Every structure is written in C-alpha cells, then in structure tokens.
C-alpha cells in the first residue's frame, strides 16, 4: 500500500503557500503539505519528514534557491523536486535541472502545469 503523498512547499509568501497547500490537498486526497518560508526551514523539514514531492520557489529570503535546491537533492535523492519562479528562460531551466530539479514551472503557469507534472510523478 502506498503512503499518502507528502509535499514540501518552499515559498516565502504565507498567502501563496497557503493557497498552494489547499490546492494540493484538494487535488490529492489524503496528502500532507509541509510549508517552509525559507531555505533553513526547508532543509529541516526535508530531513525530518522525507517528503516525496517538493515545490521550491527560487527567490528565498535567506539563501539562493539554487543552493537550497542542491542541498534538497542531496538530502532527498528519491524525491521529485519542481522549481518555480516568476523569472523564465532557458538559462534558468538548464540551471535548475543541473542543480537536481526534476522540472521547472513558471509561476504564471501555475497551477495547471504543476498539477500535470505531479499527476505524472504520482501515477
């Protein structure tokens, strides 16, 4: 029996994090959403809870999102990690993939594209 999906949302805005959390809990029944507002919290929650899925905003208040992404990938080798940002460009997508992300979704494409990715990963 598979365990319920555990998501880690790394998002500095409490309003955005709350909206994402509600959206994920509605889209995936029995899921659990952990929320970190900065890189240090993200790393602590990741090591304490081993989430299966991570959504990380690349603009964080304490450290560069790419740096946290690299550390999350090292701590969570089996987890699926998606990076997100308002910034876009091939350079950014290539950078997050090199850092260990499984994908990138621009914030202006959320939640539709993100939902499609999570469904692929979960199924």
Where are the model-predicted features located?
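Short amphipathic alpha-helix used as the core "switch/output" element in two-component signaling
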Residues: 66-77
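Acidic catalytic/metal-coordinating carboxylates
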Residues: 38, 64-67
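Acidic, metal-coordinating helix/loop segments flanking the phosphotransfer/catalytic sites
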Residues: 35-53
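The feature encodes the CheY-like receiver
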Residues: 61
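Conserved acidic carboxylate
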Residues: 11
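Two-component/phosphorelay signaling modules centered on CheY-like receiver
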Residues: 14-34
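Hydrophobic/aromatic residues positioned on beta-strands within the core alpha/beta folds
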Residues: 83-84
């Amino acid at each position: 029996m598979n365990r319920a999906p555990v998501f880690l949302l790394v998002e500095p805005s409490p309003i955005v994090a709350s909206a994402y959390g509600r959206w994920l809990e509605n889209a995936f029944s029995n899921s659990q959403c952990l929320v970190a507002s900065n890189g240090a919290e993200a790393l602590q929650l990741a090591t304490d809870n081993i989430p299966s899925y991570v959504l990380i905003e690349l603009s964080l208040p304490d450290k560069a999102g790419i740096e946290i992404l690299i550390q999350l990938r090292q701590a969570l080798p089996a987890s699926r990690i998606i990076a997100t940002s308002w910034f876009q460009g091939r350079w950014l997508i290539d950078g997050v993939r090199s850092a260990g992300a499984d994908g990138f979704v621009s914030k202006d494409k959320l939640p539709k594209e993100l939902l499609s990715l999570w469904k692929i990963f979960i199924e």
